[in-house]
């Protein structure tokens, strides 16, 4: 699905960021938007490092492996919930195993294969990095 740049700019990732910084980020991390019906799998642990995901509308359930071998819901992410490659920046990165839609639209920003968190930080504008850390704290 193509995306509306104004809609993308309205998500918290780009709060207070200039148009040129936004465009630079979009060139480095191409965007696609997907709509998910309730119960659809949005992302699995194996896919976490491939994209940066931002919930634009609706909610998703956050699941982790349970002690008994199944999945347990550990939270709900609403508008502006960040996930995916971003997970490496916080403590629970390896505890999230999957995200399931409760009816949502998500923007995915591609992360180049092999890009490390250090590469990401060094090539991303300080405003976007600040917004990411604000969202995670």
Language-model-detected regions and their locations in the chain:
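Cytosolic regulatory regions built on CNB/CRP/Popeye-like sensor folds
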Residues: 1-137
């Amino acid at each position: 699905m193509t995306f509306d740049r104004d809609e993308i700019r309205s998500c918290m990732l780009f709060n207070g960021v200039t148009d040129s910084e936004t465009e630079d980020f979009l060139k480095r991390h191409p965007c696609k938007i997907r709509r998910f019906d309730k119960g659809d799998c949005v992302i699995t642990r194996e896919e976490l490092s491939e994209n940066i995901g931002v919930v634009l509308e609706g909610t998703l359930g956050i699941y982790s492996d349970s002690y008994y071998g199944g999945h347990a819901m550990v939270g709900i992410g609403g508008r502006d919930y960040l996930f995916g490659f971003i997970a490496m920046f916080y403590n629970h990165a390896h505890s999230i195993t999957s995200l399931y839609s409760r009816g949502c639209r998500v923007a995915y920003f591609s992360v180049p294969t092999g890009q490390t968190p250090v590469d990401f930080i060094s090539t991303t504008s300080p405003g976007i990095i600040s917004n990411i850390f604000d969202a995670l704290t």
